[in-house]
């Protein structure tokens, strides 16, 4: 039976981790053990961050919609409810962009939702 020495495999694995850790400060980018811990932690943070990004953008869109609709004398919840009753299926992102970019179209939309 031939003895298996894992030198190449281990070196590749360590190089991969150290490459991911490039840009970190101090030992976090130089020493394998510390870099491995930091890479694992940063990957967890980035995973959670991608989930939080969706929540934060939705909050931002709702906040913008509420501000824009209150200028027209209607609050956010009533606006969304009336749009739902009229079967206007625009999501919060596109409504928010409409309120920011094309304010006249948004005003017409709010006026049509009042009827």
From Swiss-Prot:
Domain of life per record: Eukaryota
Matching Gene3D superfamilies, A to Z?
6.10.160.10, Ribosomal protein L20
- UniProt keyword Plastid present: yes
CDD domains documented for this protein: Ribosomal_L20 (cd07026)
What are the recorded Gene Ontology BP terms? ribosomal large subunit assembly; translation
For this UniProt entry, the molecular function terms from Gene Ontology, in alphabetical order, are: rRNA binding; structural constituent of ribosome
GO CC: one term? ribonucleoprotein complex
Chief subcellular location equals plastid
Q: Which compartment or compartments is the protein found in?
A: Plastid, Chloroplast
Give yes or no: UniProt keyword Chloroplast: yes
Q: Which SUPFAM superfamilies does the annotation name?
A: Ribosomal protein L20
What keywords tag this UniProt record?
Answer: Chloroplast, Plastid, Ribonucleoprotein, Ribosomal protein, RNA-binding, rRNA-binding
Family membership, please give it.
Belongs to the bacterial ribosomal protein bL20 family.
HAMAP family registered for this protein in UniProt: Ribosomal_bL20 (MF_00382)
Protein role: Binds directly to 23S ribosomal RNA and is necessary for the in vitro assembly process of the 50S ribosomal subunit. It is not involved in the protein synthesizing functions of that subunit.
- What is the official name of this protein in its record? Large ribosomal subunit protein bL20c
Per the UniProt entry, what species is this protein from, by scientific name? Cyanidium caldarium
């Amino acid at each position: 039976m031939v003895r298996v020495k894992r030198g190449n495999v281990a070196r590749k694995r360590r190089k991969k981790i150290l490459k991911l850790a490039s840009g970190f400060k101090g030992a976090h980018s130089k020493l394998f053990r510390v870099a491995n811990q930091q890479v694992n932690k940063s990957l967890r943070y980035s995973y959670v961050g991608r989930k939080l990004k969706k929540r934060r953008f939705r909050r931002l869109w709702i906040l913008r919609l509420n501000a824009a609709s209150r200028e027209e004398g209607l609050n956010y919840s009533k606006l969304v409810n009336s749009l739902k009753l009229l079967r206007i299926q625009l999501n919060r992102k596109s409504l928010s962009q409409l309120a920011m970019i094309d304010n006249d179209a948004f005003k017409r939309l709010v006026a049509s939702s009042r009827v």
